[in-house]
A protein has these predicted regions:
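Positively charged, low-complexity/disordered segments
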Residues: 1-15
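Polytopic transmembrane helical bundles with strong interfacial aromatic enrichment
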Residues: 16-145
């Protein structure tokens, strides 16, 4: 019994490290991409394209901050949060990085580059929204530990 509890504890700690690291990495990248957009892309992109790129940067930062806060507090929840955190990260990645590809692809790789990413953006957004809804539902249902 004690060994099983210890194994579960170790798995939770490893998961916390992974999601915390990935959230921190995504926050750092949102800062880098924001600076890249504000300086290097200003002369390359049209204002509407720059605004679209900025939406990806903004949501990447917001969603990554949320994942960081939750991953640092997994011990406070009376329910499993691992799947929710991974869904949040996947949704954020699909949403933001598909926007980056759609905006930057035509400028660097040709007019039709990354057009296939068009449907990926709303799928990533939906995954992000649903994962936050599941988190809130479970929080209301099970509360905190």
């Amino acid at each position: 019994q004690r060994y099983i509890s210890y194994a579960v504890f170790c798995l939770k700690k490893k998961m916390e490290k992974q999601t915390t690291f990935l959230a921190g990495l995504m926050i750092m990248l949102s800062i880098v991409f924001g600076a890249f957009g504000a300086h290097a892309l200003k002369t390359i992109l049209e204002p509407t394209q720059l605004d679209t790129f900025d939406v990806g940067v903004r949501y990447q930062g917001f969603l990554a901050m949320g994942v960081l806060v939750l991953s640092l507090n997994t011990h406070r929840f009376a329910f499993q949060i691992k799947g929710i955190l991974w869904a949040m990260l996947i949704g954020m990645f699909l949403f933001s990085f598909s926007i980056y590809g759609l905006v930057l692809g035509p400028h660097f790789l040709g007019a039709n580059a990354f057009r296939f990413l068009g449907p990926v953006t709303p799928i990533g957004g939906a995954i992000s929204i649903i994962s936050w809804c599941v988190f809130l539902f479970r929080l209301l249902k099970y509360g905190q530990a």
